[in-house]
Amino acid sequence: MNSFLSELSKKEKETINQMRKLIVEIDSNVKEKVGNIMSSKNCFVYEDEGVFKYGLSKTKNHFSFHSMIMYSDQEVHKFIVENSKDLRIQKGCVNFSNVDKFPIDLFKEFLTISEKADFSPVINHYKRKK
């Protein structure tokens, strides 16, 4: 897999790999691949039935965790907004300047809540578009 990992420090690699592991353990419906997310190249992309669900990317200025669950479910979005202090929250992604800013326990809880959300309307929407 040719990903952004090669650009990271040892600590950053360990944390990103821990996040990757949690994503596939907590949400067993997703499959990981390397791809592009918007203008970011060589990202980790997680799809559910061929539909983008999550992504991990690195830009020049920050890391991002992208989430279609967060985008489509107000309660999931509300959870991360209310429980984050060092994260920059957007509609469908969480930006963090370094890996210490997104505590792994918060990430795990966020994924656990996300996995329980009904993603089928999003899957059905994108399958109809194909």
How would you name each of these model-derived features?
Residues 1-130:
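Charge-dense, helix-prone N-terminal extensions
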